[in-house]
Amino acid sequence: MAPRIEAQEIETYWNIFSTRTNGGKFLNGEQAAPVLKNSGLRDDQLERVWDLADVDNDGNLDFEEFCVAMRVIFDLLNGEYADVPTTLPDWLVPESKAHLVQANRALTGKAVQFEQVEDEDDSPGLKDGFDWYMSPADKAKYEQIYQENRDMRGEVAFSALQDLYESLEVPDTDIRSAWNLINPSAGSSINKDACLAFLHILNNRHEGFRIPRTVPASLRASFERNQIDYQIDSARNNAAAQSRWATRADDETSTGRKAKFGDQYLTRLGRSGFKSAGTDFSSGAKTDAEWEEVRLKKQLAELDEKMAKVEAGVERRKGGQRDSKPALVKRELDQLLDYKRKQLRELEEGGGAAKAGGNLKSVGEDLQTVREQVEGLEGHLRSRQEVLEQLRREIEDERAGR
């Protein structure tokens, strides 16, 4: 299984990166120098590490490129490399920059071609008679796998199918032989037609047939035209193909396993859509939007911490004097309102001053005055309640992470 940068490692790099950039998106040479030199590597090695990690050649390292630089340094220190590698391994190429690496390899002629592996004619259990004919069911399955793994240009890299390789009973040498066979130009990726042919070869090898040594001339020419006659020699081979596919898919035989080619792989994919090669530095890639979400979550956590401190201070103050000024004013107004209502009720019921024989006109005037006072106090109470509610809303907004 290919190496990878684990989530915990990415988190460590993120803490270093965010601290050095103060929340920015890029790390310049001056900011990165203390971190890189702390490794103890020579200056010339660190310069080559920088050039290797700066995939887009903008003179700065974004977070993904910083992860690449740190991982290369750690691999050097741990003895994985004797010296700084001249090119990035495919698994370490940032997913968002894979197209830049592929373009650079194409321009410099550094596209990787696997070592040619000779077929072993004496491989036990393998059969002759590889058939280039693709049944409609097989072709549909190949196209589904292609759709799940193609990049934005409609091409598939060798490493994009790593999970498929692991689900097959096919040696790595045979997989690479098949790749070399349909990729004679040693490109970093192949188009749809070549991908379908590659999957067909793997399917037959999974069934127990030897990898073919050559591609038919007509098929090779159709690769160059980006068109393939998938029914090559179909009239001659159709009857034989039908007899080979006669075994039921659930039979535990080599031909039964053929029908299951890629089924486990596609089930694990769950038709999840485009899946490109490279490392997606989010334990499996974060986009710029996702890293922005990380930054915002960090800021939110800081605001929550500040709010917790403010609330703790409020609670401490409440311990000494429980009532804030708005609450104290509200309580006094409530008490005054209750008193005036009580006076009004006594006057209306003939108690108090009226019972003592007070002047009826005077009582009426007092009653009107009390009513006005009560209305004024109620209006004032409403206004103070609105002010209090506004204060509460502001506190809630601040607490929600404004």
UniProtKB/Swiss-Prot annotation:
Q: Where in the cell is it found?
A: Cell membrane; Endosome membrane; Cytoplasm, Cytoskeleton, Actin patch
Please tell me whether the keyword Cell membrane is annotated for this protein.
yes
**Gene3D superfamilies the record matches:** EF-hand
Major subcellular location class: membrane
Q: How does it sit in the membrane?
A: Peripheral membrane protein
Q: Which GO terms describe its molecular function?
A: actin binding; calcium ion binding
In the UniProt record, does the keyword Plastid occur?
Answer: no
SUPFAM superfamilies membership: EF-hand
Q: Which cysteines are joined by disulfide bonds?
A: none
Q: Which residues bind Ca(2+)?
A: 54, 56, 58, 60, 65
Q: Which GO terms describe its cellular component?
A: actin cortical patch; endosome membrane; plasma membrane
Alphabetic keyword roster: Actin-binding, Calcium, Cell membrane, Coiled coil, Cytoplasm, Cytoskeleton, Endocytosis, Endosome, Membrane, Metal-binding, Repeat
Physiological role: Component of the PAN1 actin cytoskeleton-regulatory complex required for the internalization of endosomes during actin-coupled endocytosis. The complex links the site of endocytosis to the cell membrane-associated actin cytoskeleton. Mediates uptake of external molecules and vacuolar degradation of plasma membrane proteins. Plays a role in the proper organization of the cell membrane-associated actin cytoskeleton and promotes its destabilization.
Question: Which family is annotated?
Answer: Belongs to the END3 family.
Give the PANTHER family listed for this entry. ACTIN CYTOSKELETON-REGULATORY COMPLEX PROTEIN END3 (PTHR11216:SF74), EH DOMAIN (PTHR11216)
Identification of the protein by name: Actin cytoskeleton-regulatory complex protein END3
For this protein's source organism, the top of the classification is: Eukaryota, Fungi, Dikarya, Ascomycota, Pezizomycotina
Q: Which gene encodes it?
A: END3
